[in-house]
């Protein structure tokens, strides 16, 4: 099991409940695949450095988790097919 960190930005058109529902969805992907979520830091709505997909702000979330090496690929796939995700990044923690 390795430690990972992911940051993702969600569309600002979501309301607060939609934002939290998406975060719970990604947490459940990790937990259903046998991983554990160590920390979730909701940064809230922030301005982007530049426009992405014609939006200039988004909901930022930082999530730390522990999982096997296949889970980040599955989480990346889920991020890509979720329309509300503007940007995401998954890195391995040393």
From Swiss-Prot:
Binds together with bS18 to 16S ribosomal RNA. HAMAP family: Ribosomal_bS6. The gene is rpsF. This is Small ribosomal subunit protein bS6. Gene3D superfamilies: 3.30.70.60. GO terms for biological process: translation. Keywords: Ribonucleoprotein, Ribosomal protein, RNA-binding, rRNA-binding. It comes from the Bacteria. It comes from Clostridium botulinum (strain 657 / Type Ba4). CDD domains: bS6. GO terms for cellular component: cytoplasm; ribonucleoprotein complex; ribosome. GO terms for molecular function: small ribosomal subunit rRNA binding; structural constituent of ribosome. Belongs to the bacterial ribosomal protein bS6 family. The keyword rRNA-binding applies. InterPro entries: Ribosomal_bS6 (IPR000529), Ribosomal_bS6_sf (IPR035980), Ribosomal_S6_plastid/chlpt (IPR020814), Transl_elong_EF1B/ribsomal_bS6 (IPR014717).
